[in-house]
Amino acid sequence: MQIILLEKVANLGNLGDIVKVKDGYARNFLIPNRKARRATKEAIAEFEVRRAELEKIAAEKLAASQAVGEKLNGQAFEVTQKSGVDGRLFGSVTNGDVAELLKKAGFEVEKLQVRMPEGPLKMIGEHVVQVALHTDVVVDVTINVIGDHA
């Protein structure tokens, strides 16, 4: 399916690019999240009329993300979980838990923005987690998992 991107999408393209993607990706993710539209003649003409407005909105989002990124970059947060004597957690700390922790600290972060390269945290100690505030703004946050011996 041919689509026109309404914002920058990682690994796909920038604002205004016309790209071909699989139908399911377009119908189930890009179009419902208002990241893209079908690339019909009418949609392309309408996009060209709104291009300046969309570019201004994209620049504002990027600036806001960079401002939040400067505050968030390098910060450390603590989370307490029940653990065994060997340092393994009963359960794990997931990206949803990290997003909740950041929301309590005053940062608007969604679960999908938290990237954990090694998967959920299952051991006590300090772990570095990436937070993708924008496709161009990715910051590192340290999560210190403290064990609560059961």
Swiss-Prot record:
Transmembrane segments: none annotated. Pfam families: Ribosomal_L9_C, Ribosomal_L9_N. Disulfide bonds: none annotated. One of its GO terms (biological process) is translation. GO terms for cellular component: ribonucleoprotein complex; ribosome. It comes from the Bacteria. One of its GO terms (molecular function) is structural constituent of ribosome. Keywords: Ribonucleoprotein, Ribosomal protein, RNA-binding, rRNA-binding. NCBIfam families: L9. Binds to the 23S rRNA. Belongs to the bacterial ribosomal protein bL9 family. This is Large ribosomal subunit protein bL9. It comes from Burkholderia vietnamiensis (strain G4 / LMG 22486).
